[in-house]
Amino acid sequence: MRLTALTAFADNYIWMLIDDDGAAVVVDPGDAAPVLALADQGLRVDSILLTHHHDDHIGGVPALQARFPGVRVIAPVEERIPTATERVGEGERVQALGRMFHVLSVPGHTRSHIAFHTAEHLFSGDSLFSLGCGRLFEGTPSQLLASMLKLGALPAQLLLCCAHEYTVSNAVFARHVDPANAALWQRQEEALAMRRDDRSTLPVTLANEFDCNPFLRVHTAPIRASVSAHLGRDVVDDVDVMAGLRHWKDGFRA
């Protein structure tokens, strides 16, 4: 099965797993047009996986349902996704095109955000980005921490397939927070080179994120010290670190 990413809008990725017969599992199709362009060449959409209700992730679903009647649309338990045909939550499994997709509840960016992972890939939506995480629109720092801990416990060899190309901008903040991290410096240089060549910085291994992403490293001494210095006081616990780090990122200007 082949992994591919379609670009949409300014920086979205629509991830797809395509089998040898041209059938696809499509993740977060905010825009139907790039998927339909492949459908005109023979692609068949078997299933759609949705991580959360934001329109840049679900906006293309009605057009895909019109093109592929009966297509499965698998989404979180969320009334703001009326196109869903199946709703799933923490610990459930979805079988599609012979692959098993495990469902994780990862609230923070939204209250009902989920992620899907196979034995090879993590489709994280807007919960986890390379070198960053999603802004807290509906969740709490405590929920965000729990979600990051859950994602941080996944196998290191999984490939992170997140929904936005934010790596270069996230790297600037991450290096500001963790300037002595040599692995982070290397990741930034690689990402800059990729973008100069108009290449995607994704997917990336979770192992790399474990080494470089400050939101997966709130328990470490460098991140705690940096957040404490930014706040002008000692942090209380990991929730305090996460809250301070997320608020810092929200207002950060390079």
From Swiss-Prot:
| Binding residues annotated for Zn(2+) 1, in chain numbering | 52, 54, 109, 126
Q: Cross-referenced Pfam families, in alphabetical order?
A: HAGH_C, Lactamase_B
How the cofactor is bound: the record states:
Binds 2 Zn(2+) ions per subunit.
EC category name: hydrolase
What are its E.C. numbers?
Answer: 3.1.2.6
- Record keywords, A-Z: Hydrolase, Metal-binding, Zinc
Q: Which reaction does it catalyse?
A: an S-(2-hydroxyacyl)glutathione + H2O = a 2-hydroxy carboxylate + glutathione + H(+)
Q: Name one GO molecular function term.
A: metal ion binding
Domain of life where this protein originates: Bacteria
Q: Which residues are recorded as binding Zn(2+) 2?
A: 56-57, 126, 164
Q: Which coenzyme or cofactor does it need?
A: Zn(2+)
Q: What InterPro entries does the record point to? A: Clx_II_MBL (IPR035680), Glyoxalase_II_hydrolase (IPR050110), HAGH_C (IPR032282), Hydroxyacylglutathione_Hdrlase (IPR017782), Metallo-B-lactamas (IPR001279), RibonucZ/Hydroxyglut_hydro (IPR036866)
Pathway per its UniProt entry is: Secondary metabolite metabolism; methylglyoxal degradation; (R)-lactate from methylglyoxal: step 2/2
Give me any GO biological process, just one.
methylglyoxal catabolic process to D-lactate via S-lactoyl-glutathione
Q: Record's SMART domains?
A: Lactamase_B
**Free-text function comment from the UniProt entry:** Thiolesterase that catalyzes the hydrolysis of S-D-lactoyl-glutathione to form glutathione and D-lactic acid.
Known partners and oligomeric status: Monomer.
Q: Which HAMAP family match?
A: Glyoxalase_2
Q: Which family does it belong to?
A: Belongs to the metallo-beta-lactamase superfamily. Glyoxalase II family.
Protein name (Swiss-Prot/TrEMBL): Hydroxyacylglutathione hydrolase
Gene that encodes the chain: gloB
